[in-house]
Amino acid sequence: MNKVENRAERFFQQMQGKRVAFCGIGGSNLPLIKIFAQRGAVVSARDRRGYQQVQQAAELEKMGVRLVLGDGYLQDLTEEVVFRTPGMPYHLPELDAARRRGAAVTSEMEVFMDLCPCKVYGVTGSDGKTTTTTILARMLAAAGKKVHLGGNIGRPLLPDIWQIGPDDVAVVELSSFQLTMMTCRPHVAVITNVAPNHLDWHTDMAEYTDAKRNIVRYQQASDRAVLNADNTITQGFSEGLRSDVFRFSRLHEVERGTYLGQDGTLYGRDGGE
């Protein structure tokens, strides 16, 4: 067993016997519910929908998973570890109450990024993040890399953690929902732009912007941040960053990064001509 497998194994060994709740029985949580149950966690799966509407409800019950369904599905959230689905607001009263009781409230992507043994490329933005993530994954694959695509695009990556090697790359699309309160960091972070979006979910524009900034907030000197030089908000993200900053622009030249010249040619610079 290599170092990578050891780390994942240690994590799941720590989960044995722990009471773990999954809030939402959908695409991102369903594979995790099964893995945690198989690995010896005491699992509850919670969903607003009724029994007939929940995918694989009978199978989950056979695995020993306790189902908590219906409008009160978040009541009595007393588990030690709580996985929220990406679209669930971070500061729901029930989640805040769980934190006050000492629960670790987390998500699939947070755990994956913490355990991932390979280089992680993260992409976020108000527009164009899915296209950018897809292009980036294809470019890396064309360069001969084994690419694991996930996050807000594709499928959950945590169930594949044992199949990911240190020489692979993970390319993840990260929404503001996923970035809220996230303290992990991708080795390369790309922000396409930031503009008003999802303000029905976030308290205000400041909270939305702060969530987006989390993708670069915890980067180290060995990491890279790629920012939109034409977007005022993302430009401001460079202040105080420890990572190596590159920029891209359609409107003007940049000192480090890529820009579109007046002749329609794409130019790249690394601090010089």
Q: Where is each model-derived feature located?
A:
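Short, acidic/polar N-cap/turn motifs at the starts of alpha helices
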Residues: 10, 57, 176, 255-257, ...
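Adenine nucleotide phosphate-binding catalytic loops in nucleotide-utilizing enzymes
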Residues: 14, 18, 23-25, 85, ...
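N-terminal leader/targeting and accessory segments in enzymes
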Residues: 1-107
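Cofactor-binding loop segments of dinucleotide-utilizing enzymes, especially the Rossmann-like FAD-
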Residues: 25, 48, 125-126, 152, ...
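Short beta-strand "acidic-cap" motif of Rossmann-like dinucleotide-binding folds
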Residues: 42-47, 149, 171, 247
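Phosphate-binding loop of NTP-binding sites
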Residues: 74-77, 86-229, 233-244, 259
